[in-house]
Amino acid sequence: QLHPQDLPHLMTDLSKKKGPWQEEDAAYGWMDF
């Protein structure tokens, strides 16, 4: 389960792994919880 304070770190970690996100991924992918 995610918490609001985890999002900045989570988004940074995902961006390092995936590289530049497509807009769909940025808008919906990490919100799938």
Swiss-Prot record:
PTM statement from Swiss-Prot or TrEMBL: Sulfation enhances proteolytic processing, and blocks peptide degradation. Levels of sulfation differ between proteolytically-cleaved gastrins and between tissues.
Residues recorded as bearing Pyrrolidone carboxylic acid in the entry: 1
Subcellular location as annotated: Secreted
UniProt GO cellular component terms: extracellular region
List of residues that carry Phenylalanine amide: 33
GO molecular function: hormone activity
Acyltransferase keyword on record: no
Keyword match Glycoprotein: no
Keywords associated with the record: Amidation, Cleavage on pair of basic residues, Hormone, Pyrrolidone carboxylic acid, Secreted, Sulfation
Residues with PTM Sulfotyrosine: 28
Biological function: Gastrin stimulates the stomach mucosa to produce and secrete hydrochloric acid and the pancreas to secrete its digestive enzymes. It also stimulates smooth muscle contraction and increases blood circulation and water secretion in the stomach and intestine.
Family designation: Belongs to the gastrin/cholecystokinin family.
Protein name per UniProt: Gastrin
Protein source organism: Macropus giganteus
Gene: GAST
